[in-house]
Amino acid sequence: MEAFKQQNKLKKNLFQFTLKSGKGSSLNFGDIDSSKFCDELTWVDVNPIWGFYIVGGRINGQKAITAIDSGTTFIIGSRRQLKKLIEKTPGVSYLESDGMGYGVFDCNITPNVTISYGGTDFKLSREHVARGTAGKKCLLSIVGMDSGLPLETWIMGDPFFQTTSIVFDHDHKRLGFAPQK
């Protein structure tokens, strides 16, 4: 992107992801398409020590270091982190299988999963809280595995991207988040 910016092929050194199930996803380079989101963007500075896509946030009120990753199917934390999160999420039970941690819940309810950046809350919709079923139970779209990432980093994958338009601003070393339309 830096090369395109230097060649004046981009207005700004940024890109914007808006991922949707089915049609309507977009990837914009060089400018922000505000028709893709509601409200204003919430900007969060990126700490260059951690890397560009790693920012501090909260998951259901718990402090979290998060890696923003469009290529991950789930939201992933360590098993310890997931167990701690589930203990504070009514209606969800924790189970382990094959070295992975899972949250399961009655498919007739929708557990509250809220991700916060810069003081703004982004609530996962029912469609994005559940990822499959196990009998009469639904599986939470947040899983636990011990990935070896430093600082027990959460990986914010597809369920977060499906609800939020995200701007990666390289010029100002920040990320912008807004709920999708």
Tell me the role of every PLM-derived stretch.
Residues 1-181:
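Active-site or ligand-binding cleft "flap/edge" segments
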